[in-house]
């Protein structure tokens, strides 16, 4: 609400500066006529050809305003209002893919009364159909829809009826009501939402409803076969919904049709009735109710998610209640799901109540999810993880005739009332907790699950939340302590909210004034004399700040240890996993790479740490659960970096909207810690705030991350060695020959370069490029970078993209970089899966090459290495020539691929680091010798 008011205030402040634009109802009518006739509309444009309002528009005398057809330009309301408009359809009939409508306000004096005539019907105040972008618009008017005999679908919303693209930062305060009761065609559906009705069909990947708020009551009375109703969207289809809030009451009432048949099924949710797209960081405060002659799938967030998708980091505070005459599935977050939905990190505070009729079939009431079932065609199971319920659960008998051991009994539980898996699928309810009461008049109950069939259960909910306080302390609104495991205060520990740092005092206490609306975490920069407490491999150095808190406190415990002078860090890049059964990436991560990492870790005598350098998943947010499980196989602290593919690829406007998944599963996107004598800094340098669907992500540090870097380094002596870990290298990338391109155009490059150039040495590690690369700025004649900076890029650990076989596109084996720290010095080498340090190259005999030469692929060769030497009979014959090209072994694998999509993504690279030599005539064997930049000599023999 505050966000919307601020937007409107700013817009109104500068609106008077525009002399041109639409300033009266007559202007609006004239513009619509001219636009629809294909005539010039420049007289209503501002300097950049945007159609704009220049004043509030009084529509009291306007009758039957024509709609704006297929709008392809930009329309800016400048915060002005349409007043006294008695509408029957939206202002825009259709906003085209290139269209943008923004900053338009519909006043409370307006009303939309839309009457369906039986055919397909779309209605919303701003647009009946949206294929473009609608942003920063607000509706205060009431929307009323009715249809006495529906022959086709109806889509009704406060702002948009049928949405196939982007609705961003919009709000609805008007009531949205629909009445489709009566003698109606049974197969017809209706979708009703406070912001939009939605769409069932295909949508572009960028389709999103985000940062939207509904505060109006949304209600529907229907006799149709399917009713989809949500506080924000009825049925958004595959559009993602992120950072949306509902504060309005949502009521679904399915009634018998006039012929007495009971046909309806309601999907009812605080945010959406049904969805096939991800939902992240959404909240519901409104009461959600389903009643009448219907079955209902009803949830505080979504009634029925119906695809492989994620519902993550969502909160429900509203009461969820079902009183229908047929069986219903009722949940604090999700009502019913029969697809491989991943519900993660959600919390329910609202009461969940089933008081309906359920004589012959199962009905449920669950604090997080009501019912989970497995269809026969299922290839994957559902996950419910790291969720907490505080709401009270209540279930009536419902006239149910089954005893508690029957799957068709009424089920009530604190987390999932009825959880069905299958022996051949992975289904789980893990790391969840219930603090609410369970009251049921019959059937089966449980604190976590009422029934869990072929499902993995167990674990404990993570204790990673700070405690909300009623009021700030005298010295700050974010306070806490850091103690050691014996209870002794730990002085001097750096504590951050992701923007600023403070240090703990002699009592181990810290305090700061933080903007809790923008700070999601409070966390530590762990000192070198502390060991990491881990949960499933992830260091527990952070606490999540409760949303809406005015103040919070967080308490941390660390174990003291001697500073480890010698240790090893495994740098792992780009697992890029998709869910099991898609492209083999998850199988490779779980069965090949992670076990090899763990085996290597176990073989080391000194402490070992793991840093995963981003692109942990690959454009598929449901893969996060299984990625994390694979990483947990590494029995030691594992630090993670966010990469571009860790965002959902439809993300726009704000980087935070895409990083929400990483934050939900992993934690902060930038943080630091000390190991031995070195200071490690992990940060996000992928900017995903593109402003148009055709834009793309870019690189650099945003203002918040840059401020954090400054604050962090302000506490670090200049004689320290800094290790940076990011997905894209902040200084150098291997995009051009011979040494790659500099990143001088990255966001805030000069500022962060200036900061890092002041330190003794900086080693900048990254993934992203799917190849090994090294660059040392020392001695280079370039205006970029600094002589204290060295850059190291690591190849994709799971092999070539989409192929995920043992050899990657440049011929390097699946593997990772091993960094060995010995006091103040460090070195590194590439470790292939199943091999050791000694294996740094692969040689090919003349029989395997196209030019009858001996070739060797040295996949980690770089400046500082020696030129490879060719030996015959123990005697050096020649230096080998650098002849980059396609690796023969990888080409052999590639030629066996038949899938066209796979071949498209894993084409052999012509940049394999190959060296060649022509052997002496008659010689049938020899060896290659090469020395790396740390003085280690490697030998590879070859014979033919």
Describe the predicted segments one by one.
Residues 20-468:
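Surface-exposed repetitive/solenoidal architectures
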Residues 475-479, 484-499:
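Short, ordered, surface-exposed loop/turn motifs in non-cytosolic proteins
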Residues 779-862, 866-871, 914-920, 925-944:
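Binuclear metal-dependent phosphoesterase catalytic core
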Residues 528-536, 540-548, 621-716, 742-763, ...:
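Extended active-site neighborhood of metal-dependent phosphoesterases/phosphodiesterases
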Residues 496-515, 887:
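Short, acidic Ser/Thr/Gly-rich low-complexity loop/linker segments typical of extracellular
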Residues 509, 887-917:
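Aromatic sugar-binding surface patches on proteins
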Residues 477, 529-624:
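N-terminal active-site segment of His-dependent metallophosphoesterases
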Residues 466-477:
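Beta-strand-rich domain onsets/edges
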């Amino acid at each position: 609400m505050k966000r919307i008011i601020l937007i409107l205030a700013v817009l109104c402040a500068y609106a008077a500066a525009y002399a041109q634009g639409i300033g009266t109802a007559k202007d609006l009518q004239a513009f619509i006529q001219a636009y629809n006739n294909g005539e010039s509309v420049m007289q209503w444009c501002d300097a950049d050809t945007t159609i704009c309002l220049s004043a509030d528009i009084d529509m009291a005398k306007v009758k039957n305003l024509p709609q704006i057809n297929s709008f392809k330009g930009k329309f800016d309301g400048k915060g002005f209002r349409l007043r006294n408009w008695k509408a029957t359809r939206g202002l825009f009939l259709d906003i085209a893919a290139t269209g943008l409508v923004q900053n338009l306000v519909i006043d409370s004096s307006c009303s939309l009364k839309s009457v369906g005539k039986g055919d397909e019907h779309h209605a919303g105040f701003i647009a009946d159909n949206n294929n473009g972008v609608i942003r920063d618009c607000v509706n205060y008017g009431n929307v009323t829809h009715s249809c006495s005999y529906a022959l086709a679908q109806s889509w009704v919303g406060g702002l948009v009826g049928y949405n196939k693209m982007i609705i961003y930062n919009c709000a609805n305060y008007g009531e949205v009501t629909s009445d489709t009761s009566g003698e109606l065609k049974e197969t017809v559906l209706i979708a009703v939402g406070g912001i939009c009705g939605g769409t069932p069909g295909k949508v572009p990947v960028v389709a999103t409803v985000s940062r939207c708020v509904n505060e109006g009551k949304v209600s529907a009375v229907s006799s149709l076969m399917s009713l989809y109703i949500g506080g924000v969207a009825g049925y958004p289809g595959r559009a993602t919904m992120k950072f949306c809030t509902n504060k309005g009451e949502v009521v679904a009432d399915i009634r018998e049709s006039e012929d007495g048949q009971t046909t309806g099924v309601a999907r009812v949710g605080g945010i959406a009735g049904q969805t096939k797209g991800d939902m992240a960081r959404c909240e519901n405060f409104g009461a959600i109710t389903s009643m009448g002659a219907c079955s209902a799938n009803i949830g505080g967030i979504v009634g029925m998610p119906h695809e492989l998708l994620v519902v993550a980091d969502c909160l429900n505070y509203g009461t969820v209640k079902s009183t229908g005459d047929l069986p219903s599935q009722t949940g604090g977050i999700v009502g019913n799901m029969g697809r491989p939905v991943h519900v993660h990190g959600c919390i329910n505070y609202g009461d969940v109540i089933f008081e309906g009729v359920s004589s012959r079939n199962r009905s449920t009431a669950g604090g997080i999810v009501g019912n989970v079932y497995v269809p026969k065609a299922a290839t994957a199971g559902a996950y419910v993880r790291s969720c907490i319920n505080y709401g009270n659960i209540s279930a009536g008998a419902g006239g149910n005739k089954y005893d508690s051991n029957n799957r068709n009994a009424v089920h009530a539980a604190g987390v999932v009332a009825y959880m069905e898996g299958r022996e051949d699928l992975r289904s789980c309810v893990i790391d969840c907790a219930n603090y609410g009461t369970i009251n049921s008049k019959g059937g089966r109950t449980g604190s976590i699950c009422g029934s869990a069939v072929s499902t993995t259960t167990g674990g404990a909910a993570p204790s990673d939340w700070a405690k909300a306080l009623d009021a700030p302390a005298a010295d700050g609104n974010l306070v806490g302590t850091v103690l050691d495991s014996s209870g002794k205060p730990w002085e001097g520990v750096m504590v951050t909210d992701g923007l600023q740092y403070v240090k703990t005092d002699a009592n181990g206490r810290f305090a700061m004034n933080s903007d809790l609306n923008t700070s999601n975490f409070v966390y530590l920069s762990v000192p070198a004399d502390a060991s990491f407490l881990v949960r499933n491999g992830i260091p527990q150095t952070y606490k999540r700040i409760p949303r809406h808190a005015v103040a919070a406190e967080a308490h941390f415990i660390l174990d003291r240890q001697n500073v480890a002078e010698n240790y090893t860090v495994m740098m792992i890049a780009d697992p890029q996993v998709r869910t099991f059964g898609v492209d083999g990436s998850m199988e490779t991560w779980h069965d090949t790479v992670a076990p090899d990492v763990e085996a290597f870790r176990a073989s080391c005598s000194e402490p070992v740490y793991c840093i995963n350098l981003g692109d942990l998943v690959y454009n598929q947010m449901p893969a996060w659960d299984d990625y994390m499980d694979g990483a947990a196989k590494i029995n030691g602290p594992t630090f993670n970096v966010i990469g571009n593919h860790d965002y959902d690829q439809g993300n726009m406007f704000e980087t935070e909207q895409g990083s929400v998944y990483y934050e939900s599963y992993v934690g902060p996107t930038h943080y630091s810690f000390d190991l031995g004598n070195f200071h490690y800094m992990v940060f996000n340098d992928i900017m995903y705030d593109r402003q148009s669907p055709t834009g793309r992500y870019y690189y650099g540090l945003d203002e918040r991350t840059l401020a954090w870097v400054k604050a962090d380094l302000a506490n670090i002596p200049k004689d320290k060695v800094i290790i940076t870990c990011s997905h894209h290298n902040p200084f150098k990338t291997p995009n051009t020959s011979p040494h790659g391109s500099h990143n001088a155009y990255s966001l805030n490059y000069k500022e962060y370069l200036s900061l890092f150039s002041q330190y003794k040495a900086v080693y900048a590690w990254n993934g992203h490029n799917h190849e090994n690369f090294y660059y040392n700025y020392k001695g280079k004649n370039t205006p970029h970078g600094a002589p204290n900076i060295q850059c190291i890029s690591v190849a994709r650990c799971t092999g070539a993209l989409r192929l995920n076989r043992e050899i990657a596109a440049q011929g390097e084996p699946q593997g990772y970089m091993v960094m060995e720290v010995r006091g103040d010095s460090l070195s590194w080498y590439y470790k292939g899966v199943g091999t050791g340090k000694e294996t740094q190259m692969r040689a090919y005999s003349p029989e395997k090459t196209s030019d009858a030469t001996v070739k060797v692929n040295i996949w980690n060769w770089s400046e500082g290495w020696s030129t490879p030497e060719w030996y015959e009979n123990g005697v050096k014959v020649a230096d080998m020539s650098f002849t980059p090209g396609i690796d023969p072994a990888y080409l052999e694998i590639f030629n066996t691929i038949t899938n066209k999509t796979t071949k498209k993504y894993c084409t052999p690279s012509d940049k394999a680091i190959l060296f060649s030599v022509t052997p002496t005539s008659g010689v049938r064997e020899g060896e290659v010798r090469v020395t790396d930049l740390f003085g280690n000599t490697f030998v590879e023999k070859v014979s033919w």
